[in-house]
């Protein structure tokens, strides 16, 4: 009973740390965007559903792949945390670019088509990061002290990542559809 409570407390703590890293990455991205010398060359998006999907999905897929692979290594925990930081930076730069290029229409576009799906994807990435940290932490315990978690199940880990990847794909498809509709309505 005590061990279960301890594990739950560690899960809550790791989720809070991952959320903080994501927020710090978002703040860093906003500061970084503000320091850019010229944004006139920025191209926000393509005006097709597939164009919007192809702009957003590769980066989040790369982050998921990084989290998945790094979970199988005992020494990649900094990489797992850095992946969430990178997502926060890219999200903030994207939102800042929309605000800067389109003004109040960009604010409405961001409010309806970027933020809801970005929050969902952030949640899914935090869950993936937590699972990767858990598996790599148990591998670290096994490698360095010989007494890692004996109940580590790679099949369950892979299943969780498949489910989270499926949810992210659905979320990105919905985000692309909503983005396309908002572009037409707001004349962006």
Where in the sequence are the language-model features?
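Cytosolic juxtamembrane amphipathic/interface segments immediately preceding
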Residues: 1-12, 67-68, 147-155
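N-terminal signal-anchor transmembrane alpha helix
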Residues: 5-36
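Interfacial/capping segments of alpha-helical transmembrane domains
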Residues: 31-49
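Interfacial helix-start motif at the membrane-water boundary
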Residues: 48-76
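Conserved mixed alpha/beta catalytic, RNA-binding, or beta-rich assembly cores of soluble enzyme
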Residues: 75-103
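Alpha-helical transmembrane segments of helical membrane proteins, especially in multi-pass transport
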Residues: 113-137, 168
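Interfacial loop-to-transmembrane junctions
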Residues: 142-165
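Final/C-terminal transmembrane alpha-helix of multipass membrane proteins
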Residues: 157-181
């Amino acid at each position: 009973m005590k061990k279960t409570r301890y594990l739950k407390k560690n899960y809550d703590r790791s989720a809070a740390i991952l959320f903080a890293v994501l927020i710090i990455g978002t703040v860093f991205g906003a500061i970084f965007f503000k320091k850019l010398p010229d944004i006139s060359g920025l191209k926000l998006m393509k005006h097709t559903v597939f164009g919007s999907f192809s702009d957003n999905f590769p980066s989040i897929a790369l982050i998921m792949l990084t989290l998945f692979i790094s979970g199988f290594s005992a020494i990649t925990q900094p990489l797992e945390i850095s992946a969430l930081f990178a997502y926060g930076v890219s999200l903030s730069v994207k939102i800042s670019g929309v605000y800067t290029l389109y003004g109040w229409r960009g604010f409405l576009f961001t409010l309806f088509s970027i933020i809801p799906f970005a929050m969902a994807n952030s949640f899914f990435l935090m869950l993936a990061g937590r699972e990767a940290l858990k598996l790599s932490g148990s591998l670290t315990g096994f490698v360095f002290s010989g007494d890692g978690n004996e109940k580590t199940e790679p099949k369950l880990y892979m299943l969780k990542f498949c489910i989270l990847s499926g949810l992210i794909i659905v979320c990105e498809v919905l985000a692309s559809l909503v983005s396309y509709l908002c572009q037409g309505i707001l004349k962006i």
